[in-house]
From Swiss-Prot:
Coiled coil: none annotated. This is Probable alpha-L-glutamate ligase 2. One of its GO terms (cellular component) is cytoplasm. Mg(2+) 2 binds at residues 260, 262. Its cofactor is Mg(2+); Mn(2+). It comes from the Bacteria. The keyword Magnesium applies. Keywords: ATP-binding, Ligase, Magnesium, Manganese, Metal-binding, Nucleotide-binding, Protein biosynthesis. It comes from Shewanella amazonensis (strain ATCC BAA-1098 / SB2B). PROSITE patterns: ATP_GRASP. Belongs to the RimK family. GO terms for molecular function: ATP binding; metal ion binding; ribosomal S6-glutamic acid ligase activity. Mn(2+) 2 binds at residues 260, 262.
Amino acid sequence: MKIGVLSQFPELYSTRRLVEACESRGHEAWVINPINCYMNINSVKPSIHLEGEEVPMFDAIIPRIHASVTFYGCAVVRQFEMMGVFAANDSISIARSRDKLRALQLLSRKGIGMPVTGFANKPNNIPDLINMVGGAPLVIKLLEGTQGIGVVLAETRKAAESVIEAFLGLKANIMVQEYIKEANGSDIRCFVVGDKVVAAMRRQGPEGDFRSNLHLGGSAEPVKITPQERKSAVAAAKAMGLVVAGVDILRSARGPLVLEVNSAPGIEGIEQATGIKVAEPIVEYIEKVVAARRANHQVIA
């Protein structure tokens, strides 16, 4: 097969591992920067171009769309979909997961456990918003934040009111979440491919920081997840429509709570923490889907 890896960063570990996994299984891998692509949108032969030339027809693409370019990146993925290319994470699923509020609403609709979350637009709603999530301490998150940036722990009601007022004064979209004290600054990252959790690690925030993101200096170790945690992770990915997902879960007194569903989960951290190769299962999944699509096409023909 010819597989395109859509990434702005060919030198990144995640990109290199995906290329390696494709090639080790006998496939041709191309790294394409989606931001440098441009599209010919027509009803006869839609195409994608790069540096004056038409991009070759791929059997499948693996999107690694950075959060800062979600809109354009999703447009490129959608163009590939229009051309009949299988996307391991389609444009709709990526867009769903990137909208943090919409993602939580989808999880809520499916009955998947998550922290109680409030969302408001007016300063006069702040007192009720704080009560909604059980009072302080509570967590305040910028909807546009990534990798732990724009996440604040307000330890008192007064601090919460001040931070929320400041964000709303800046016209920033924020959500307020209950603080899960028993998680003790750690979470579990489940790496989901299809309907399986292929690896899981426990991430612990640095001393004095409740955020467990590895980019912020957190540590990671392999973890054995419970059947309920496994079920929640797969269900959360499915709720977004994602084939490949990093699902972040908190262990709470009332069971697993899904914090976030990531459509382009990092590969380096989880492979190094667990010793499990997660890039290969992605390629194996693609092989099965493309083979089934070809068989179906032959039957129809």
